[in-house]
Amino acid sequence: MLVRTRVRRVAATATLVALAVGGLSMTRAQAQNKLAVSIAVPAYFNDDDSWDRAINTSVVTYIVGHPDTPANGKFVAAKELTAHLAQAKAKGKTTLIYVTAGYDKIGWEEVANRIDSAFDAYPNADGVFIDEINYDQCDKYKSLSAGSGSIKGVRDRHPGKQIVLNPGAPMLNCYQGLADGYLNLERADKDVQAWTNNVNLPGNTPYYAWMFKPDIRPQIWQMVHSVPTGDVDRAVDAAVARNASVLYVTPDVLPNPYDKLPDDSVWNKIIDRVQQYATGKVPLPAVKQLVIPANAATTTIKASADTAGTATTKKPTATTKKKTTKTTKKR
């Protein structure tokens, strides 16, 4: 989410290449996230207290730092953010740098350059969190992993770095294998039902079923804001039931739901519930599988080695998109 802020608009079969990349990606994700369920904190704030609480929470496994992007598109290391990220790494957290892809408003070569610049400014970061991507343009994002086209893959230029893609919406099956993490739901709590309705439309299930498979769980992220304070346990449970392994739940609201951590009393409730899943005290629920049509083998998009990651010719019938609002944040 570009929050500083916004509400974002909001592949069952992969190719041999994508499967190979996906296998490596899954290994990285599982190695980094040893807990069955954990928290990723979008640390789009400056105050030391919020950073300290996030860093010292055992079930927080990922922290996303949000640097300012200068007008020339080049990241310049901020002393304060560099120090916070170093403290997080010292506590065993996986640190990611926020980079926006700007939907179709930013050229893909510029996005690739921003990623390079982010790693130049923050070389010790473990990866990038790429926001504002399109749910249906796999051909663009394939270049991140496979290095096809005119842009060399990020994997080749930055080996060992993680990639998390964030459309904040359901992603087509052709994305499978292109990243280490997929944030497939990011919205207000009251709007989650619309997401559920979308992925369960009969015409959509072949495209979205991959996100609900048990073996993909370590790579599925979800973030839900505007949650009533008394319902944070329920919001955690619901995210886990949707196959999310990495999550963030907050009662904070737009225009910037990530400008602070929840108050201690609420944060502790969230931590306690996640901890119950992480330790196995509460077993992971059986994910409610999508209703796959009997002819799924023929209706599911299949990619060949020549078309891996290419946007599908037939798209889901009612993909939900979210509007974007932006605010300015000082660092």
Give, region by region, the residue ranges found by the protein language model.
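Secretory targeting and sorting signals
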Residues: 1-31
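C-terminal region of N-terminal signal peptides and the immediate post-cleavage residues
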Residues: 22-34, 307-313, 320, 328
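Glycan-processing catalytic domains of CAZymes
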Residues: 32-294
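Fibrous stalk/shaft segments of extracellular and virion attachment machinery
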Residues: 97, 304-308
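N-terminal propeptides/leader regions of secreted preproproteins
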Residues: 295-296, 306
